[in-house]
A protein has these predicted regions:
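Short beta-strand/turn micro-motifs at beta-sheet edges
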Residues: 25-30, 65-66
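Short glycine-/aliphatic-rich beta-strand segments at the starts of folded cytosolic domains
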Residues: 28-45
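Alpha-helix C-terminal capping/helix-coil junction sites
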Residues: 14-15, 59
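Beta-hairpin "wing" of winged helix-turn-helix
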Residues: 16-26
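Non-DNA-binding regulatory cores of transcription-related proteins
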Residues: 43-109
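Conserved beta-strand core positions
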Residues: 8, 37-39, 76
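Short, low-order "capping/linker" segments at domain edges
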Residues: 82-86, 115-127
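Single conserved hydrophobic/aromatic residue that forms the stacking wall/gate
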Residues: 1-12
Length: 127
């Protein structure tokens, strides 16, 4: 009965939109993607249309596994995964720098991943 209740609760959450999907997490190194780069991007502020175009272009890039609009020094923070430094150079020069409205790019290379994926902190829901 315990397993049935757990599955029922997951089904209810799934229907309520709490669960956004299910995925297998691959080990990047094991599939030849040994370099993770966090890329801060500043964009030109001339037209909202350009910013929308930039968001659309970034969303279509398979190397970009996460993209966030952020406050601070950069406008966007991208998480890029590529095989190696040479592949990142090719991606940077051949793709990123050519996106609509890009003004400046700052690359930060991950030396070691300490916590790749954590669960959401849901303690506040129990209050």
């Amino acid at each position: 009965h315990k397993e049935y209740r757990r599955q029922r609760q997951m089904c209810i959450r799934d229907r309520a939109g709490v669960i956004q999907g299910y995925e297998a997490r691959l080990a990047p190194d094991e599939v030849g993607l040994g370099l993770t780069v966090f890329v801060g991007v500043k964009v030109e502020r001339h037209h909202e249309r350009d910013a929308a175009q930039f968001r659309q272009e970034v969303s279509a890039l398979p190397e970009v596994v996460a993209a966030h609009l952020v406050s601070g020094e950069s406008d966007f923070l991208l998480q890029v995964v590529v095989p190696d430094l040479r592949a990142y150079e090719t991606f940077l020069l051949g793709t990123l720098l050519k996106l609509t409205g890009v003004k400046d790019i700052r690359s930060n290379f991950a030396i070691q991943t300490v916590k790749p994926h954590g669960p959401l902190p849901l303690d506040h829901l129990g209050r």
